[in-house]
UniProtKB/Swiss-Prot annotation:
The gene is 5. Substrate binds at H506, R518, K522, Y526. Gene3D superfamilies: 3.30.70.370, Ribonuclease H-like superfamily/Ribonuclease H, Taq DNA Polymerase, Chain T, domain 4. One of its GO terms (biological process) is double-strand break repair. Its cofactor is Mg(2+). Composed of two subunits. One is encoded by the phage and the other is encoded by the host thioredoxin. Mg(2+) 2 binds at D5, E7, D174. SMART domains: POLAc. GO terms for molecular function: 3'-5' exonuclease activity; DNA binding; DNA-directed DNA polymerase activity; metal ion binding; nucleotide binding. Mg(2+) 3 binds at D475, D654. Pfam families: DNA_pol_A. It comes from Enterobacteria phage T3. PROSITE patterns: DNA_POLYMERASE_A. This is DNA-directed DNA polymerase.
Length: 704
């Protein structure tokens, strides 16, 4: 086994120069350094390990080192170089798997000062250097310090422009940290049987003897790194035109809002608490006041006649009277960009906030206001005006003006290469960033059709025929309920699963919760499964917290298998639990449930356990599904990539969007995805049949 790391002059898309590389070889126990002129020898050493059937360990290798080496070998040496997936271990992938609850375990290190705040919850190699006590400083910080001492100005990224010996030293230190991290990860007995020395085995033994989750996460990371490099073809012109339309509507709304809400006076500048006139008790709910020390109705007498009252004193022209409290105010013009102004006007119109920030301010966004209704038509019109403004502002932020706006992330190839963390959530779900492609508005949302249509295989023209590619969108059918049915089957002999496949599960749930409509039942069950509180559940039928609590109670009484499942989970996790001063104090047996692939899925609280179990099951099913789909397509002789037959563009929770060179290939992808999903169900002995639905079209609007 080799542990390695490279330094180069840029990120993957712009990298052109290999600076240095380091290998730690477990066979001789030595660190081997390779400078710019040794690039060929470095590649030879890696290839020799592959030929031996060995393993090469990088940190973030799947996403950076491995594809960067392929690119640099061609650029600098005109050499074909490809490391096979099965020969590569990524400690970043392992860290995210084994320490998915890192933020919980980092608190002690943060308090003790062992871990800097900027590294809290981070899986980066530098963060692990601090945790493991192997950190010897950070190259970028030291480089900046050196420039400062020399009186030179730092330009962002310049530390990677040219090779230097300090870089070589840090490269060695990175491998020291990677080795220490690897050994820490391999010592976890849950994932790696302790009787095997995993640093002294070939790749076949490593993958077959470690827990299945280790293999699943590495395969997913490899595939999703490929998806990132593929990118999602994007219609820049269409979104620029949409931006013009949205900006015009925003200007119109700004005028309407300012006219509708005008201006008002509000307290500002008071320095003292207002006290009750009779009791003298401070009244904190009232605005702060000022109590003048000077001023009056009349000025002091300035001659004998005024003192004797024969002549009136002059009027005091000062604005205040000494000892007479007043509330200072300011004149405010409505500002639609101010959340404080918006929530003030909404509450005046009759809106009662139910969701608050950590600091106690009402949360104001288009989603929170979606269901707000008041009886007064004028006030409702005012609320609707604000709702539309917030929605327009959100669309503008997503598409054009925000830091992570789509237009800011279109690469030179006309595609958006969104970042995916394959195990970003504690449940095993992926998370998305730069930009977040999981938050593209749906086709039923305002402007959703234009947004989705901009992402599409049709925007990629084939390099040979010049024809647009075809899109295949496939999603898992009713996954949440099928996962619930799988876990309920032990308690109801598969009755719930049978109803899903052969009956009408939403009508069954409607009757169980005694809800007025089938649509209410659909909203209820998904809210229930995702851990919605009593207040949220009550809102489904236009009521509050008490009604929500009652609906849950009825549902559990009439669906005893779910109640039994919840009880079973509680018994597995919790030794004892009691409520003290409104807080649940739990004595845990253990704080994790077993995922479908054997992993530990960490649970934050007992009431979230069922939701965690179901979300994890859905995430892992889809993860293995996308892996198996690609594997089966390749087995059919199809090539993955824009230079081949199909290209993964996005995986969002339970759906994949795949670009295909022809309609025939798109049909094959849809068929194979269904076969792969059935294979996953059989592989994990799922107690409810798993299915997919596929659509073929030109873009995401047509394929979801």
């Amino acid at each position: 086994m080799l542990v390695s790391d490279i330094e180069a002059n840029n990120l993957l898309e712009k990298v052109t120069k290999f600076h240095c590389g380091v290998i730690y070889d477990y066979r001789d126990g030595e660190y081997h350094s390779y400078r710019p002129g040794d690039f060929g020898a470095y590649l030879d050493a890696l290839e020799a390990e592959v030929k031996r059937g060995g393993l090469i360990v990088f940190h973030n290798g799947h996403k950076y080192d491995v594809p960067a080496l392929t690119k640099l070998a061609k650029l600098q040496l005109n050499r074909e170089f490809h490391l096979p997936r099965e020969n590569c271990i990524d400690t970043l992938v392992l860290s995210r798997l084994i320490h998915s609850n890192l933020k919980d375990t980092d608190m002690g290190l943060l308090r003790s000062g062992k871990l800097p705040g900027k590294r809290f919850g981070s899986h980066a190699l530098e963060a692990w250097g601090y945790r493991l006590g192997e950190m010897k400083g950070e190259y970028k910080d030291d480089f900046k310090r050196m420039l400062e001492e020399q009186g030179e100005e730092y330009v962002d990224g310049m530390e990677w422009w040219n090779f230097n010996e300090e870089m070589m030293d840090y490269n060695v230190q990175d491998v020291v940290v990677t080795k220490a991290l690897l050994e820490k990860l391999l010592s976890d007995k849950h994932y790696f049987p302790p009787e095997i020395d995993f640093t002294d085995v070939g790749y076949t033994t490593f993958w077959s003897e470690s827990l299945e989750a280790v293999d699943v996460e590495h395969r997913a990371a490899w595939l999703l790194a490929k998806q990132e490099r593929n990118g999602f073809p994007f219609d820049t012109k269409a979104i620029e035109e949409l931006y013009v339309e949205l900006a015009a509507r925003r200007s119109e709304l700004l005028r309407n809002l300012t006219e509708t809400f005008g201006s008002w006076y509000q307290p500002k500048g008071g320095t003292e608490m207002f006290c009750h006139p009779r009791t003298g008790k401070p009244l904190p709910k009232y605005p702060r006041i000022k109590i003048p020390k000077v001023g009056g109705i009349f000025k002091k007498p300035k001659n004998k006649a005024q003192r004797e009252g024969r002549e009136p004193c002059e009027l005091d022209t000062r604005e205040y009277v000494a000892g007479a409290p007043y509330t200072p105010v300011e004149h405010v013009v409505f500002n639609p960009s101010s959340r404080d102004h918006i929530q003030k006007k909404l509450q005046e119109a009759g809106w009662v906030p139910t969701k608050f920030t950590d600091k106690g301010a009402p949360v104001v966004d288009d989603e929170v206001l979606e269901g707000v209704r008041v009886d007064d038509p004028e006030k409702q019109a005012a609320i609707d005006l604000i709702k539309e403004y917030l929605m327009i502002q959100k669309r503008i932020g997503q598409s054009a003006e925000g830091d992570k706006a789509w237009l800011r992330y279109v690469a030179e190839d006309g595609k958006i290469h969104g970042s995916v963390n394959p195990n970003g959530a504690v449940t095993g779900r992926a998370t998305h960033a730069f930009p977040n492609l999981a938050q593209i508005p749906g086709v039923r949302s305002p402007y959703g059709e234009q947004c989705r249509a901009a992402f599409g295989a049709e925007h990629h023209l084939d390099g040979i025929t010049g024809k647009p590619w075809v899109q295949a969108g496939i999603d898992a059918s009713g996954l949440e309920l099928r996962c619930l049915a799988h876990f309920m089957a032990r308690f109801d002999n598969g009755e719930y699963a049978h109803e899903i496949l052969n009956g009408d599960i939403h009508t069954k749930n409607q009757m169980a919760a005694e809800l007025p409509t089938r649509d209410n039942a659909k909203t209820f069950i998904y809210g229930f499964l995702y851990g919605a509180g009593d207040e949220k559940i009550g809102q489904i039928v236009g009521a509050g917290k008490e009604r929500g609590k009652e609906l849950k109670k009825k549902f559990l009484e009439n669906t005893p298998a779910i109640a039994a499942l919840r009880e079973s989970i509680q018994q597995t996790l919790v030794e004892s639990s009691q409520w003290v001063a409104g807080e649940q104090q739990v004595k845990w047996k253990r704080r994790w449930i077993k995922g479908l692939d054997g992993r530990k899925v960490h649970v934050r609280s007992p009431h979230a356990a069922l939701n965690t179990l179901l979300q994890s099951a859905g995430a892992l099913i889809c993860k293995l599904w996308i892996i198996k789909t690609e594997e089966m397509l390749v087995e059919k002789g199809l090539k993955h990539g824009w230079d081949g037959d199909f290209a993964y563009m996005a995986w969002i929770h339970d759906e994949i969007q795949v670009a295909c060179r022809t309609e025939e290939i798109a049909k094959t992808v849809i068929e194979v995805a269904q076969e792969a999903m059935r294979w996953v169900g059989e592989h994990w002995n799922f107690r409810c049949l798993l299915d997919t639905e596929g659509k073929m079209g030109a873009n995401w609007k047509e394929c979801h």
